[in-house]
Regions:
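Enriched for short, Lys/Arg-rich terminal
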Residues: 2-4, 8-26, 30, 49-50, ...
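Generic amphipathic, hydrophobic interface segment in small proteins and small subunits
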Residues: 30-55
Length: 86
């Protein structure tokens, strides 16, 4: 499935590149690959979000940070890659 990124998500990717944290960069890469193949299962403990974020999904990058995304029939939209559900 094709992946699109919101501007905030692109800013978050730049943030992670600037940190130089190769472990997190590699983790994000693996998570994005998994999301593109199996959006609702796989690594990172995928979970549907609730309340105001109903329809969104998240996966754990670290204890503190999550990837938040939505899935349509042919696309995945990455919303953010930092913090919890912001």
């Amino acid at each position: 499935m094709e992946i699109d990124y919101l501007d905030k998500a692109l800013d978050d990717i730049e943030f992670w590149k600037k940190t130089g944290d190769k472990v997190i960069q590699k983790r994000i890469s693996k998570l994005l690959e998994s999301i593109s193949k199996t959006p609702y299962s796989g690594i990172g403990k995928p979970e549907p979000l609730k309340h105001q974020l109903s329809g969104y999904w998240s996966r754990r990058i670290t204890e503190e940070h999550r990837i938040v995304y939505t899935v349509s029939s042919d696309r995945i939209k990455i919303i953010s890659l930092r913090f919890h559900y912001t």
